């Protein structure tokens, strides 16, 4: 996402350093009263998740009327490479501390997650309200881990509305809407829902999804995300 750092609306900020000293970079837009978070590459080998995030975010920063309206309303925070050491070393899931970073959202023992948490706390202290968190990953089959429908008022069930709309536009793309009850697992999704009671979704793309299919479908997911978010008060 290096080209995005050159976007006129984006500020690049080093949040901290990994265990081996690599920067944890965030891309941040202008301050608004509401913020949407996008995270990626907590698990090093999950390539399709990273590629999906790239195409998704490219659509969010496009010059369409929809994208411009979305960026005018929401502050956006992107941390696309949370585990740079693991990526460099070819690790399966862990950082150089031997920790799965997507199980450190609670203990906050690792410098990579501590760096991201400091920014979240900073925006909290400034009164900026989180409205959505998407965490991009890969797995065997494309699926979206969400909260349960009963966790929100029916008219505020973002995940259901978002994924239903996306499916209508691409019925040939195989993915699962996979609501889960809150658990004790200390991952990003559970942390954001427990702390802020907002839609917090693990966006999983199948390991074998064709790259051209990612480029076709990710912008549609982004467009429908923006539409649903803009409809909410």
Give the ranges of each region predicted by the language model.
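Active-site/substrate-binding loop(s) of hydrolase catalytic cores
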Residues: 12, 17-19, 23, 31-176, ...
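Short glycine-rich, acidic/polar surface loops and turns
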Residues: 25, 180-196
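Non-catalytic propeptide/linker segments at domain boundaries
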Residues: 1-9, 15
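His/Asp/Glu-rich mid-to-C-terminal helical/loop segments that flank catalytic regions of hydrolases
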Residues: 209-233
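Generic secondary-structure signature for well-ordered alpha-helical cores
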Residues: 6, 121, 168-171, 226, ...
